[in-house]
Amino acid sequence: MYYRDMKKKYVIGIVFAILMVSLFYLKRENNTRALFSWRSEVISEEADELIEFINDNKFNTLYQEFDLDDVESIQAFGNKTDIQLYHLCGSPDWDIERIKEEILAVYKVNQDITTNIKGLVVDIEPYLKADWDKNKKKIMNSYIDDMIEANEYAAKLGLEYFLCIPYWYEAGNVDRLVKDGCDGLVVMNYYKGKELEHLSDEMESCFRYNKELVTAFEMQEAGKHDLSENNTYHDEGLGAVNEIYEKIYNRYPRIGLAVHYYDVLK
């Protein structure tokens, strides 16, 4: 009797352990691992190579700048992969009407294809405006208002709306953006060794409002776009990025990963 009870407890313990491990890996599999790709023609000219790179590096999400007029190429690419697709777009000179045009264009593409573009990843960078230093507060408030309106519009069309932001926005601005201006943040977290420290405000807001948070790593070589060695993992490679992200994930498993960008990695 004692032996049977012990054996039963042992079996239950093994089953429980297997279940926990399975849930852990399922959670990891569902966590965002995104790749940026800015060149729209890559999905037609290098589709197989891109998909192979995605699979080899265990990405499950692609932030791709699509040519929204080339519906045939978007459909053909979508037929080859089940990766989650988001339209990557944006420019400092985009006003709310231009942003809404892009949202509507994505919606219309989805009506014409069986592949689904889940939403938009919008990289506006208002701090690149010529008068930023003189009118920072006004520009930022206008940007936040635009993002709130754009997010509402995207939601009405059934599209997710993510924002790319730098790690240094003031906490109050981050909170306003997260609360009403997006479904989640992709933080361009370009400062080696301080990735977690620089996510503190974004974590507080995203966790409070139950929004997604993704930390992005730069892979371009130092010297380009004013990048220094402190900003990029170009020399260290994806292996180092994965090690850093693993430490972040172990503490905060809700945080996803993004890598910027495909053309400098292939």
Language model: regions and residue ranges:
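Substrate-binding cleft of secreted/luminal carbohydrate-active enzymes
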Residues: 192, 212-266
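Aromatic-lined carbohydrate-recognition surfaces of secreted/lumenal glycan-active proteins
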Residues: 38, 84-94, 144-173, 212-223, ...
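Aromatic- and acid-rich polysaccharide-binding/catalytic face
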Residues: 59, 64-67, 128, 171-200
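Aromatic-lined substrate-binding rim segments of carbohydrate-active enzymes
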Residues: 50-53, 61-91, 134-161
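Boundary/entry segment of secreted carbohydrate-active catalytic domains
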Residues: 23-68, 162-167, 256-265
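N-terminal Sec-pathway targeting helices
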Residues: 2-17
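Short, acidic/polar
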Residues: 40-55, 98-113, 169-178, 199, ...
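Active-site groove signature of glycoside hydrolases
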Residues: 63-66, 106-140, 255-259
